A protein has these predicted regions:
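A glycine- and charged-residue-rich anion-binding loop/surface
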Residues: 1-222
């Protein structure tokens, strides 16, 4: 992780920023632009990439590579050029709401029924979560009610980077051996989980969690 250049971790509510171009090459998907600093979140952790503009030119994908974060852009820039980045904030905030909502839902499922989230997909309209055990419609409705009670409570979402000793002692959902810095997202009373995504400040900002459907899927439940 190169947190010094990742503005979305310093403050996920940054909508505009200025930076300097450090690399720009033409690729198969347009121009691949790297910046000294960026607020554009790269696809990862189940969360879609941010969209927006760099100096008015569309950014239509963002990916993390071994070299750093690459912005796929419709226009070329000169190395050393100062530029202004602007996020598609509606898309970003929607993704933040959805991702935190997924944590709340998955955490409550795990706490009440012991099932793990074994699959997670976010798109523009719907989120799907696959759980490792079968839940009845009544149980899914129970989880939905508990989630919305947590939203009304407006619980603050905490972010921390425990050291190795503290991490070993810490209880969190889906715990497994991880290398490097481990970022813990904590929603008190609902969930604690390692996650690289960006989240809202408090559960009240999620707005509402509504289950559209649930079904048996590969020996478990898809919601």
């Amino acid at each position: 992780m190169t947190a010094m250049t990742e503005l979305f971790y310093r403050d996920p509510y940054v909508r505009e920023f200025t930076s300097k171009v450090i690399s720009c090459v033409e690729g198969e998907k347009g121009f691949e632009v790297m910046l000294e600093d960026t607020a554009f979140y790269p696809e990862g952790g189940g969360q879609p990439a941010d969209h927006g503009t760099i100096d008015g030119a569309a950014v239509f994908d963002v990916r993390r590579t071994p070299a750093g974060i690459v912005h796929y852009c419709e226009k070329a820039f000169d190395v050393g050029q100062d530029v202004k980045g602007v996020l598609d904030w509606e898309r970003r905030f929607d993704n933040m709401q959805n991702h935190t909502g997924e944590h709340v839902f998955s955490g409550i499922v795990n706490a009440r029924f012991g099932f793990d989230n074994v699959g997670f997909h976010m798109d523009d309209d719907v989120i799907t979560c696959d759980f490792s055990g079968v839940m009845t419609e009544e149980q899914v409705a129970e989880v939905e009610r508990a989630c919305n009670e947590a939203i009304v409570a407006n619980v603050e979402v905490g972010i921390s980077f425990p050291d190795a000793e503290a991490l070993e002692k810490l209880a969190y959902r889906s715990k497994k051996a991880l290398k490097g810095d481990v970022r813990i997202v904590d929603v008190p009373g609902c969930d604690r989980c390692a996650c690289c995504g960006v989240h809202v400040r408090s559960t009240g900002e999620i707005g509402l969690i509504k289950v559209l459907s649930s079904m048996k899927h590969r020996g478990g439940t898809r919601v």
